[in-house]
């Protein structure tokens, strides 16, 4: 990243009246030998994130299956040794980001990664320090891994630092389990759907988040690939209207219907 990029990014955002909620990077905290290269990449993203005035960095673990071929590239489960160092590595990175960039680390569970199921998410949270490592709750990926979003919010609400709202089609999830599909193939089959279809219910998620004593960025997503360029905009409009009906809008705190 050129040393001029952070300044240029800030200028371009300001010229368009845009604000950035956070940065996103991919990184393997369980691969001890990859720390230096991972940190170099994350530092570049953190510098741009801070320059844009944002204070969150979403870290997504690598997938253990090739997204295009479905081939396994490593074990779906971490070894005891890898787990032993995972929380420490996350905290080390989170502390560095906070001290040097004033950016908070939030880890993002992801389909076909070793942080996918609810037990894996809970283990990550239990083995890390809330001062440095917290959760980007992606409701769709949690559902994909068989987790309970509402339960996670209720029991680990203080660790939810950032949110991605997304819904999954239960029928396609059943195909994933029955046919051992990769996430890439699941997306091609339409696993990500627009509300009110799919799980979890956005209304229930918003209502549970509203109970937290926290101000959170909630990013609305729907994975669509491949897709024609004209497809996303109508979906974005209808999704915005539905979520507004659930009480989620541009306000600082959800106005949940009683």
Per-segment meaning from a language model:
Residues 1-8, 28-39, 65-67, 111-117, ...:
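Acidic-and-aromatic substrate-binding clefts and catalytic sites of carbohydrate-active enzymes
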Residues 216-246:
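C-terminal/domain-terminus segments
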Residues 31-135:
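Active-site acidic/histidine proton-transfer and metal-coordination neighborhood
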Residues 196-212:
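A short, acidic, amphipathic alpha-helical segment used as a generic capping/interface helix at domain edges
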Residues 1-56, 80, 84, 91, ...:
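N-terminal pre-domain/capping segments
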Residues 87-199, 248-253:
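Acidic/histidine-rich catalytic cores of soluble enzymes
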Residues 13, 49, 105, 138, ...:
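Conserved, mostly hydrophobic/aromatic
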């Amino acid at each position: 990243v050129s040393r001029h990029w952070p300044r240029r990014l800030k200028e371009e955002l300001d010229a368009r009246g845009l604000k950035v909620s956070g940065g996103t990077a991919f990184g393997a905290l369980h691969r001890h030998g990859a720390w230096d290269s991972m940190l170099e990449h994350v530092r570049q993203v953190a510098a741009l994130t801070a320059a844009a005035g944002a204070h969150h960095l979403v870290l997504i673990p690598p997938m253990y299956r090739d997204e295009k071929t479905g081939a396994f590239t490593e074990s779906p489960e971490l070894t005891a040794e890898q787990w032993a160092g995972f929380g420490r590595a996350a905290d080390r990175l989170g502390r560095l980001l906070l001290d040097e960039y004033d950016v908070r680390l939030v880890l993002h569970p992801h389909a076909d990664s070793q942080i996918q199921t609810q037990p894996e998410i809970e283990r990550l949270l239990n083995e890390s320090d809330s001062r440095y490592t917290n959760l980007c709750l992606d409701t769709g990926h949690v559902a994909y891994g068989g987790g309970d979003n509402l339960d996670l919010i209720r029991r680990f609400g203080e660790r939810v630092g950032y949110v991605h709202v997304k819904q999954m089609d239960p029928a396609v999830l059943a195909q994933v389990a029955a046919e051992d599909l990769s996430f890439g193939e699941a997306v091609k089959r339409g696993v990500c759907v627009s509300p009110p279809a799919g799980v979890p219910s956005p209304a229930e998620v918003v209502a549970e988040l509203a109970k937290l004593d926290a101000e959170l960025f909630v990013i609305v997503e729907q994975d669509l690939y491949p897709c024609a360029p004209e497809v996303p905009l109508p979906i974005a409009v209808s999704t915005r209207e539905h979520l507004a009906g659930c009480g989620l809008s541009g306000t600082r705190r959800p106005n949940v219907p009683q």
